[in-house]
């Protein structure tokens, strides 16, 4: 009679969350920061191209940034007066010049100003590691930049700019100045690679026993 096979799924479930256990427990209760992305927001009105400043938010790792798009209730204004924006994530030069072509990429689009359920909301989580194959990873002690542009064929609007500073921590020392774009072909940070390399030999030994 063949020996009974050992169930591997419970073991995998025990091994894979190891990295999550190493995260700072003090950040278990993350903060949320709201940004209302419209030109009537006075925080944006101090932002002039070339001044190097503008709307700034300070966050910590595992915090959330909630972007609220422009929204209009009844009676609705004329369509040409409704604000619509395409939001980009850019580098420092793109933020200073309000030019999304400076290593910028489209992040969100505020294209439903009269949505019946309320304003569109987009959320960014500032995390060291992401479980998603197309997620972004952020580093403490660095700044990240967002700007908006008017969609084509619409009335041009002033550029709105946002700078997010991720506060440094005592436990992490990273030098990556830009958000890391992850894919299925790479490990999400050194912790993920180390976990994978240490887990594989254990699984092979169990399969061969």
Curated annotation (Swiss-Prot):
Lipid-modified sites (GPI-anchor amidated asparagine): 184
GO cellular component, one term: plasma membrane
SUPFAM superfamilies named in the record: Cupredoxins
Molecular function GO labels: ephrin receptor binding
GO BP, one annotated term: ephrin receptor signaling pathway
Cited InterPro entries: Cupredoxin, Ephrin, Ephrin-A_Ecto, Ephrin_CS, Ephrin_RBD
Propeptide: 185-209
Gene3D superfamilies: Cupredoxins - blue copper proteins (2.60.40.420)
UniProt keyword list: Cell membrane, Disulfide bond, Glycoprotein, GPI-anchor, Lipoprotein, Membrane, Signal
Domain spans labelled Ephrin RBD: 30-170
Tissue: Expressed in myogenic progenitor cells.
Localization terms from the record: Cell membrane
Covalent S-S links between cysteines: 69-110, 98-159
Record-linked PROSITE patterns: EPHRIN_RBD_1 (PS01299), EPHRIN_RBD_2 (PS51551)
Pfam families: Ephrin (PF00812)
Domain of life where this protein originates: Eukaryota
Subunit structure: Binds to the receptor tyrosine kinases EPHA3, EPHA4 and EPHA5. Interacts with EPHA8; activates EPHA8.
Entry similarity comment: Belongs to the ephrin family.
Function (record text): Cell surface GPI-bound ligand for Eph receptors, a family of receptor tyrosine kinases which are crucial for migration, repulsion and adhesion during neuronal, vascular and epithelial development. Binds promiscuously Eph receptors residing on adjacent cells, leading to contact-dependent bidirectional signaling into neighboring cells. The signaling pathway downstream of the receptor is referred to as forward signaling while the signaling pathway downstream of the ephrin ligand is referred to as reverse signaling.
Protein's recorded name: Ephrin-A2
Name of the gene encoding the protein in the UniProt record: Efna2
């Amino acid at each position: 009679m063949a020996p009974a096979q050992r169930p591997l799924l419970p073991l995998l479930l025990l091994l894979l969350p190891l990295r999550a256990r190493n995260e700072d427990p003090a950040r278990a209760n993350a903060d949320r920061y709201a940004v209302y992305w419209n030109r009537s927001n006075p925080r944006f009105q101090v932002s002039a191209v070339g001044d190097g400043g503008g709307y700034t938010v300070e966050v910590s790792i595992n915090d959330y940034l909630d972007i609220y798009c422009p929204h209009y209730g009844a009676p609705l204004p004329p369509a040409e007066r409704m604000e619509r924006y395409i939001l980009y994530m850019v580098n420092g030069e793109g933020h200073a010049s309000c030019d999304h072509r400076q290593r910028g990429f489209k992040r969100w689009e505020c294209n439903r100003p009269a949505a019946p359920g309320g304003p569109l909301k987009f959320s960014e989580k500032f995390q060291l590691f992401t479980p998603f194959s197309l997620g972004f990873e952020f580093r403490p002690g660095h700044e990240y930049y967002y700007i908006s542009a008017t969609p084509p064929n619409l009335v041009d609007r002033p550029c709105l700019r946002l700078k997010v500073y991720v506060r440094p921590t005592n436990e992490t020392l990273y030098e990556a100045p830009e958000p890391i774009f992850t894919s299925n072909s790479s490990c999400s940070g050194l912790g993920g690679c180390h976990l994978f390399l240490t887990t594989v030999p254990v699984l092979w030994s169990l399969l061969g026993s």
